A protein has these predicted regions:
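Extracytoplasmic c-type cytochrome modules immediately beyond a signal peptide or single-pass transmembrane anchor
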Residues: 19-101, 216-228
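N-terminal Sec-pathway targeting helices
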Residues: 1-15, 19-22
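Acidic/proline-rich low-complexity IDRs
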Residues: 4-5, 10, 43, 63-66, ...
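Extracytoplasmic redox metalloprotein regions
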Residues: 72-229
Length: 229
């Protein structure tokens, strides 16, 4: 009887643990319907599937400009990089917010193929999809992320303290960020193979109609990749 009870308890613990791991690292939650309902919005904000889990964990992405403002070109956070940004939205064009276990931010084609314009100084900026590409903003962003990762303050204690100003993470989520997501993100951002500007990518940015394979698209997104544990 005791043995059966012990086996039952072990099974419950194993199942609960497996379910927690699935929820925290692998559960795929669709993006909001408004993104897929419009081709323009899907291009600007839709997640690109390159066959691997990727992205900067959302709360790290949010904390970095606040923790390292000195590495931005000027005050203003990500907006200072010259990225195309619609005023009513949370993040610039070219960024996709995706929940695969944890919420992460990934890049898509609009990082290089979107621009904004406004009618007059007081006009509301309008983001246009797929014009001639521009990679200057992305180069500035890559430099920013690398400088952050090289800074000794890019550590769990500093980042979680900044995140705590925005949201109170659960104990489990704090442990995941401290021991998994923050170390893996730092390692990924410091890996030179994750920051790739091939001649083909630069040529494509100047001529968006040129052939651009899925493999090269994967390289474009590799700078913000973190592998699933």
């Amino acid at each position: 009887m005791k043995r059966k009870l012990l086996i039952a308890v072990v099974l419950i613990v194993v199942i609960a643990g497996a379910y927690t791991v699935w929820c925290k690292f692998y559960r795929d939650v669709p993006q909001p319907q408004w993104i897929g309902a419009d081709q323009r919005d899907e291009f600007l904000y839709g997640a690109v599937d390159t066959g691997e889990a990727q992205g900067i964990p959302y709360w790290i992405w949010l904390a970095l400009p606040r923790l390292f403002p000195e590495y931005m070109p000027r005050p203003g956070g990500y907006a200072s990089l010259g990225l195309s940004w619609e005023q009513t939205l949370e993040m610039p064009a070219g960024f996709a917010k995706k929940n695969v276990g944890y919420v992460r931010v990934t890049g898509n084609c609009a990082l290089c193929h979107a621009s904004s314009s406004s009618a007059g100084a007081d006009g509301v900026p309008t983001v246009v999809a797929a014009p001639a590409g521009e990679i200057t903003s992305m180069q500035l962003m890559l430099t920013f992320y690398r400088q952050c990762a090289e800074d000794p303050r890019f550590n769990a204690s500093e980042i979680l303290a900044e995140v705590d100003n925005a949201i109170k993470l659960s104990v489990v989520d704090k442990l995941i960020y401290r021991y998994v997501l923050i170390p893996r993100t730092k390692k990924a951002l410091l890996n030179p193979e994750r920051v790739i500007f091939t001649p083909e990518l630069v040529a494509h940015a100047g001529n968006p109609q040129a052939e651009f394979s899925g493999q090269r698209l994967k390289k474009l997104a590799d700078w913000m990749k973190t592998q699933r544990p």
